[in-house]
Amino acid sequence: MGLEEKLPGGILLSTVEKVAGYVRKGSLWPATFGLACCAIEMMATAGPRFDISRFGMERFSATPRQADLMIVAGRVSQKMAPVLRQIYDQMAEPKWVLAMGVCASSGGMFNNYAVVQGVDHVVPVDIYLPGCPPRPEMLLHAILKLHDKIQQMPLGVNREEAIREAEQAAMALTPTIELKGLLR
């Protein structure tokens, strides 16, 4: 029994949000922010063995104004943080951020004054990808999880309110440098 038999008269019912989410998830243009060894794995993902282009990401954007996904790969220094925020602010809406690797997610093994202890203190992060460095398969899995998140994202006024609340919640978190963990 195929789809044609289940749909009366060939009519498919959906919402604009679901259709827009479906279309939007298949055409992400990433702006790479490769700062360390994770960038090498990100480049390998674009090669023929892993083929990131099957997810609609064959074009890596050279300018933030044409990108809608920022992949932060590696540690972010205190001096690089304002540049990262400026690039994020230049990206057009809708935009998403993927923190690739332990250094981008939490500062990694560089627990000192010069390294930002998690890029989420500079820009709101949508997907965290662990690993040192994460394998290309893990990056592809994170992209698929981001696709799911994009497809469920609301549109219009509801979307702007959801983004505002998420960004305020992310910026209000306790900085990881103040947390007492294994390295303290």
From Swiss-Prot:
It is a peripheral membrane protein. Pfam families: Oxidored_q6 (PF01058). Binds 1 [4Fe-4S] cluster. Its main location: membrane. It comes from the Bacteria. [4Fe-4S] cluster binds at C37, C38, C103, C132. One of its GO terms (molecular function) is 4 iron, 4 sulfur cluster binding. Keywords: 4Fe-4S, Cell membrane, Iron, Iron-sulfur, Membrane, Metal-binding, NAD, Quinone, Translocase, Transport. Its cofactor is [4Fe-4S] cluster. NDH-1 shuttles electrons from NADH, via FMN and iron-sulfur (Fe-S) centers, to quinones in the respiratory chain. The immediate electron acceptor for the enzyme in this species is believed to be a menaquinone. Couples the redox reaction to proton translocation (for every two electrons transferred, four hydrogen ions are translocated across the cytoplasmic membrane), and thus conserves the redox energy in a proton gradient. NDH-1 is composed of 14 different subunits. Subunits NuoB, C, D, E, F, and G constitute the peripheral sector of the complex. This is NADH-quinone oxidoreductase subunit B. It comes from Mycolicibacterium gilvum (strain PYR-GCK) (Mycobacterium gilvum (strain PYR-GCK)). The gene is nuoB.
